[in-house]
């Protein structure tokens, strides 16, 4: 994952959607790159995608990134998601859908990825495919990919409904309720706003 932040709101809608999926994916992935955080701090605070609904949560995300150091954000990541044994907050869909890791939701996700011709590169991604960063990266591909048979609105809507809409709100709830979450609580609020925009867009297709 090597996404660059959308530093202007003048991007066309599909490019902006793909960029935001990529940025959220990378911000939830460890280790956070100092270069990405530096870009976030320099980003304009108007909404990176058309629509005022995203503007305030985006402004808050940029603001908290500017207010915290790289070390503070890294420490918060380790506190919430790292450590030995059970993390304080899980980043995996199976946990929210079944209460356990590596369960049926992950198996179904792998089947759906196989149908799309996608698979996890174990050399670059040690986490399982139901990690929030992985499913957001898949959505980025479905929005921005060049193969129209795979990267199209129908595939986006189907994958989103099955593997993001079903559990991402619960992850956002957990982060926003956690007393030690600051940067990631704000990221959760922006993520929630973004997926709400996506849900509305897909609903209009139905």
Name every feature range the model reports, one short phrase each.
Residues 1-206:
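Surface/interface-facing alpha-helical segments and adjacent flexible terminal/loop regions used
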């Amino acid at each position: 994952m090597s996404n660059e932040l959308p530093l202007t709101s003048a991007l066309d809608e599909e490019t902006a959607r793909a960029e935001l999926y990529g940025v959220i994916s990378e911000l939830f992935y460890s280790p956070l790159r100092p270069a990405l955080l530096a870009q976030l701090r320099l980003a304009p605070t108007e909404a990176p995608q058309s629509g005022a609904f995203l503007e305030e949560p985006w402004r808050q995300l940029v603001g908290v990134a500017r207010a915290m150091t790289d070390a503070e954000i890294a420490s918060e990541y380790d506190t919430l998601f790292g450590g030995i044994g059970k993390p304080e907050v899980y980043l995996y869909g199976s946990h929210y859908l079944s209460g356990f890791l590596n369960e049926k939701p992950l198996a179904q996700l792998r089947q759906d990825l196989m149908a799309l011709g996608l698979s996890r590169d174990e050399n670059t991604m040690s986490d399982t495919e139901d990690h929030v960063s992985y499913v957001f990266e898949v959505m980025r591909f479905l929005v921005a990919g060049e193969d129209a048979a795979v990267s199209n609105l129908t595939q986006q809507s189907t994958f989103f409904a099955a593997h993001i809409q079903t559990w991402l709100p619960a992850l956002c709830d957990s982060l926003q309720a956690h007393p030690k979450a600051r940067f990631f609580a704000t990221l959760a609020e922006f993520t929630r706003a973004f997926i709400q925009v996506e849900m509305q867009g897909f609903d209009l297709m139905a």
